[in-house]
Amino acid sequence: MDIKEIKVGIADLNVGKNPDKIITVGLGSCIGIALYDGIKCIGGLSHIMLPDSTQFSKVTNPMKFADLAIPILVEKMEKLGARKNGLKAKICGGASMFNFSDKSMVMDIGNRNGKAVKEKLKELSIPLLAEDIGGNKGRTMIFDTSTGKVYIKTVGLGTKEI
């Protein structure tokens, strides 16, 4: 059985099944959302940039936004055979990559992204099993669909499993 490495770009998402590995790099203030059906060994990974699409008059890429991308990811996973009621989530990213003198929520995209992702997961009744969010360093997320394990490589801090 060949292991595929499936890349997920910024404002992108993709799905895979055992033994695929799904990878996204460049998670700063963005959030990576890994969804997993452990019975079917089907996984999906989304790399969102912004919390909410409703602030924009025209949305050209729904995968950029937490409120739109997560339901699209669930739908793609269901088409691959996943069960929505069997999905579990792990998330990472949401860093504050820049120091702003204005500490308002408007500037704190990483924190806003984290809150929006958690709200959408709760709305969809998808339990959040683990998270690695915040801080001020970039991350890479590697999702192993054979086990559901998510490995986080953080700049200057090495690799850990969540």
From Swiss-Prot:
Any Pfam family: CheD
GO biological process: chemotaxis
Catalyzed reactions per annotation: L-glutaminyl-[protein] + H2O = L-glutamyl-[protein] + NH4(+)
Any one Gene Ontology molecular-function term assigned to this protein's record: protein-glutamine glutaminase activity
SUPFAM superfamilies listed in its UniProt record: CNF1/YfiH-like putative cysteine hydrolases
Domain of life according to the entry: Bacteria
Classification via Gene3D superfamilies: 3.30.1330.200
Keywords: Chemotaxis, Hydrolase
E.C. number: 3.5.1.44
PANTHER family linked to this entry: CHEMORECEPTOR GLUTAMINE DEAMIDASE CHED-RELATED (PTHR35147:SF1)
Function, in words: Probably deamidates glutamine residues to glutamate on methyl-accepting chemotaxis receptors (MCPs), playing an important role in chemotaxis.
Family as reported in the entry's similarity comment: Belongs to the CheD family.
Designated name of the protein: Probable chemoreceptor glutamine deamidase CheD
Species this chain originates from: Clostridium botulinum (strain Hall / ATCC 3502 / NCTC 13319 / Type A)
Taxonomy of the source species: Bacteria, Bacillati, Bacillota, Clostridia, Eubacteriales
Gene for this chain: cheD
